[in-house]
């Protein structure tokens, strides 16, 4: 029974991250009608930026986190401006090929830049896990889960309670 509870907790934590990624893909497809194959590479780019800021440049983890997110958003905006804006109205096959090309280009650029060897950053969290009865969770994973839940909640509020969200919903239904 303890193993089952541990697996359920692990699945919930991983599911929170996947849900956040899925919401991003859904928003991009719903608004822009683009299947963003490079979405995962933007996520990886943010992770590499965290490595750069924390391990190479020595920036504080909590300062580096929003900077890495901002750089990822800026790269996504640049991709939209350079690759997709000119293709508005193009059929889905064309935009899919463009995004597959972007995915391959980003993946290979990151591999050339970072050598394809797994990187890790120093954690600001305790190394001993949080123990809740018979289950345990690392503080890193708990942090990721809480941030994912907060961002999912913020996305829900934006989509359902703001003018921007109303415009987004109208675009989805168009």
Task: Show where each model-derived region lies.
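Small-residue-rich transmembrane alpha-helical segments that form helix-helix packing/gating elements
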Residues: 1-32, 37-172
């Amino acid at each position: 029974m303890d193993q089952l509870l541990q697996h359920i907790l692990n699945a919930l934590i991983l599911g929170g991250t996947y849900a956040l990624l899925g919401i991003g893909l859904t928003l991009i497809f719903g608004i822009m009608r683009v299947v963003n194959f490079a979405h995962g590479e933007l996520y990886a780019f943010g992770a590499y930026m965290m490595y750069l800021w924390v391990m190479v440049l020595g920036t504080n983890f909590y300062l580096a986190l929003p900077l890495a997110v901002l750089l990822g958003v800026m790269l996504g905006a640049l991709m939209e401006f350079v690759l997709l804006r000119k293709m508005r109205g193009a059929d889905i096959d064309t935009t899919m090929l463009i995004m597959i090309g972007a995915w391959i280009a980003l993946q290979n650029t990151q591999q050339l830049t970072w050598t394809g060897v797994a990187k890790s950053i120093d954690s600001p969290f305790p190394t001993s896990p949080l123990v809740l009865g018979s289950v345990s969770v690392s503080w890193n994973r708990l942090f990721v889960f809480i941030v994912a839940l907060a961002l999912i909640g913020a996305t829900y509020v934006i989509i359902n309670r703001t003018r921007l969200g109303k415009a987004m919903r109208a675009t989805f239904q168009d």
